Amino acid sequence: MPKSPHRTNLQSFYPIMIILTHLALDSNCWRIRREVDGEEEDIMPSEECYHKYNEENHFKVFSNYLNRKNSSHYSPIAPSYQQALLRLQVKGLKHGEQITKSSGKCNSKKLDTISAETPLRDRALCKFEYVLNYNPKRLPAALTEVKCSCPRPNSKLVGKRIFECEHLRYQVRVLMWDDSCNTFREHVETIALACIPVIQANANADGDDDFIYTIKAEIPI
């Protein structure tokens, strides 16, 4: 008895249905809900290894690497001068916890000698400390950021009060979990990576009269 042509077509169609179903489920598993106003087209440089890697577990591998921490390396973003960092108890991480030893008082005396080997933290005009930015619902959960220790540089170094210390902030894309830790979405975290001396807004009142003056701008031709 000859086979029905419809039965043959259905048998050949089964693998296609399985592949399409797998692709649909796979795309839903890796889709991240974005917390942005508009959906801009993603930039996907072909030379990046991320786009060349064929294994399906790359997200799990990367997330494990990104969130891994121990008592000395508890953040993927950390200062290069590791000697300044304190060792923390990983089970007792607290948001805002200071993770460096104090760099001294705001009006401490000048260093007797300063060389190229002197840590940047000790040579900075604005004293700062490193603190822990911790959120257990975030990936990565632990980030290190800078906190200014003093409102302005040491007057023994800069003279009259025409400068103040402000945080230089950066925005970092992270993943934020829901309360049940079942789903996550893209989120933008703002952290301070530096404490820099800047001219304070009322510098003309605290400094010399001729320190700030008007410059006539030429009209471009």
UniProtKB/Swiss-Prot annotation:
Keywords: Disulfide bond, Glycoprotein, Secreted, Signal. The keyword Ribosomal protein does not apply. Gene3D superfamilies: Cystine-knot cytokines (2.10.90.10). Glycans are attached at N70. One of its GO terms (cellular component) is extracellular region. The keyword Secreted applies. Disulfide bonds join C148-C195. One of its GO terms (molecular function) is cytokine activity. GO terms for biological process: positive regulation of locomotion; response to oxygen levels. Expressed in RMG and AUA interneurons and ASE sensory neurons. Its main location: secreted. Residues 1-29 form the signal peptide. It is found in: Secreted. Transmembrane segments: none annotated. InterPro entries: Cystine-knot_cytokine, IL-17_fam. Belongs to the IL-17 family. Homodimer; disulfide-linked. Interacts with the receptor complex composed of ilcr-1 and ilcr-2 with the interaction being mediated by ilcr-2. Ligand for the receptor complex composed of ilcr-1 and ilcr-2. Binding to the ilcr-1/2 receptor complex triggers a signaling cascade, activating the downstream signaling components actl-1, pik-1 and nfki-1, and results in increased neuronal activity in RMG interneurons in response to input from oxygen-sensing neurons. This leads to increased animal movement and promotes aggregation behavior. Plays a role in the responsiveness of RMG interneurons to ascaroside pheromones. This is Interleukin cytokine-related protein 17.1.
